[in-house]
Regions:
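Extended C-terminal subregions enriched in glycine
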Residues: 407-415
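A surface-exposed beta-strand-loop module
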Residues: 142-167
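Short, hydrophobic/aromatic-enriched beta-strand segments in well-ordered soluble domains
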Residues: 168-176
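A glycine- and small-residue-enriched flexible loop/hinge signal that marks low-structured segments
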Residues: 2-45, 49-55, 62, 68-101, ...
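Extended beta-strand solenoid/passenger and fiber regions
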Residues: 85-150, 176-179
Length: 430
């Protein structure tokens, strides 16, 4: 038998669980995209799609600079091109299989120049496009080829020797996937009683089971000014998958029927029903060149960018974070010159905005429950988000321990893990 004489040691495996990286600001964006530009548009409807780059986003749901029509593209641009952060999850509700989302394109004559015809309509479904030379129907890929231009319009190139060869004009007809047909009900979504299929904001439930990621910020840019959508966003932030909590960034209406001046914002906030601790309300849009971005898209991207400066931890407010816009404006592009004093008036009503402080910055720490609810864990966005983040981290770190016998060793392991995370937070605080 071996004799242990002198100094000897044994090492036991560490019982402290390594913390799981949490994408605390994972944006889940529900809206519209030009999916007609895809080879299989139906595959990009009412399903959560994780995109890590601008190129991935364009491949997943299509892309257009017309943000008023295609709100997912606005969020994609705000995140990847404006603030330079990733990833985001996009959920498109514009459905080519839904007749309510279709506008029929009647016979339209387009001129042919050097064998090329340009269709200035956007949203065209190529599979339903009918192209005729006089009364002769042309066959795709035999008599002509069709491709999308960067702006979503379509170019038709006639094939030499095909039935359209030599034509000076073509007649086109078909179906257009029309984003103006989308309603608040499409964004809110629901569950089909017969099939169980989920649509709209109900798809948020699928993010964790499908992608293994926890929603952090829910968005429905521009649509969130609607009281029905605003209410649904706030409700969906609570008990996602029965466990997780999130926040939502909502636009306070600045259209012709909304708040056109800052003194009207408090009433508009109440009118929209933006009153919960989960909601962070933004009044005003931001303009970059000729492009107009909703406040919710810009502020959400700014918040996530700010998280990245603190090791993916939402312990700092997005307030006073720079956003590279050239002006703040109403939904229609009318410039609004907000100063700190006016911005503070909105903050006192639980609404954030954009002011110029050297650069343009997000301005406001308070959630929409303020001033009625002044509890710091509810009233301040960074505190609310940190509570959500801490709980999510705890759940993910300890999920493997569920249904295991609880003993002193396992309990101490949980305590040590949480203490370790707390020590990291303290050592990296900035």
């Amino acid at each position: 038998m071996a004799i242990s004489h002198g100094f000897n040691k044994t090492e036991a495996a560490t019982s402290v669980t390594a913390p799981v990286t949490v994408n605390s600001g994972l944006q889940i964006v529900v809206g519209t995209a030009p999916v007609n530009m895809l080879d299989d548009p139906e595959a990009a409807v009412n399903t959560p799609m994780l995109v890590n780059t601008f190129k991935e986003a364009a491949a997943a749901v299509g892309y257009s600079d017309d943000f008023a029509k295609y709100t997912l593209c606005e969020a994609v641009s705000a995140s990847f091109q404006v603030m330079g952060i990733s990833p985001i999850v996009v959920v498109n509700v514009l459905d080519p299989a839904n007749a309510k989302h279709i506008t029929e394109l009647s016979d339209k004559t387009v001129q042919v120049n050097d064998g090329i015809a340009e269709i200035d309509e956007t949203g065209i479904l190529l599979k339903k496009l009918v192209v005729k030379k006089e009364q002769t129907v042309l066959t795709a890929d035999e008599d002509y080829s069709a491709r999308f231009n960067d702006d979503g319009t379509v170019s038709i190139a006639l094939v030499n020797g095909g039935k359209g060869d030599g034509a000076t004009a073509l007649t086109i007809s078909g179906s257009i996937l029309d984003p103006t047909k989308i309603t608040a009900a499409d964004i809110v979504g629901g569950v089909n009683a017969a099939t169980g299929a989920e649509t709209g904001l109900e798809v948020v439930r699928q993010v964790f089971p499908k992608l293994g990621m926890v929603p952090g910020i829910l968005l429905a840019p521009r649509f969130s000014k609607d009281p029905m959508v605003c209410a649904a966003l706030q409700a969906k932030c609570r008990k996602i998958n029965g466990v997780f909590d999130a926040v939502c960034f909502v636009d306070i209406d600045s259209s012709a029927s909304g708040a056109r001046k800052y003194t009207d914002v408090a009433n508009q906030k109440v009118k929209q029903g933006a009153t919960s601790r989960e909601a962070y309300g933004l009044w005003l849009y931001g303009k970059i060149g000729s492009a107009i971005y909703s406040g919710s898209s810009l502020a959400a991207a700014a918040a996530v960018y700010n998280d990245s400066l603190y090791n993916d931890t939402p312990n700092a407010s997005p307030s006073n974070v720079s956003v590279p816009i050239s002006s703040a404006c109403l939904e229609d592009g009318t410039e609004v010159l907000m100063d700190q004093e006016q911005g503070n008036v909105l903050n006192e009503q639980g609404v954030a905005t954009f002011i110029r402080s050297g650069d343009f910055v997000v301005w406001g720490n308070e959630t929409c429950c303020y001033p009625k609810n002044t509890d710091p864990k509810d009233a301040f966005l960074c505190v609310r988000r940190f509570f959500n983040h801490s709980w999510t981290s705890f759940v993910l770190d300890n999920m493997s321990k569920l249904d295991k016998p609880m003993n002193k060793k396992r309990l101490q392991s949980i305590i040590d893990s949480e203490n370790m995370k707390g020590s990291v937070y303290v050592s990296t605080e900035g």
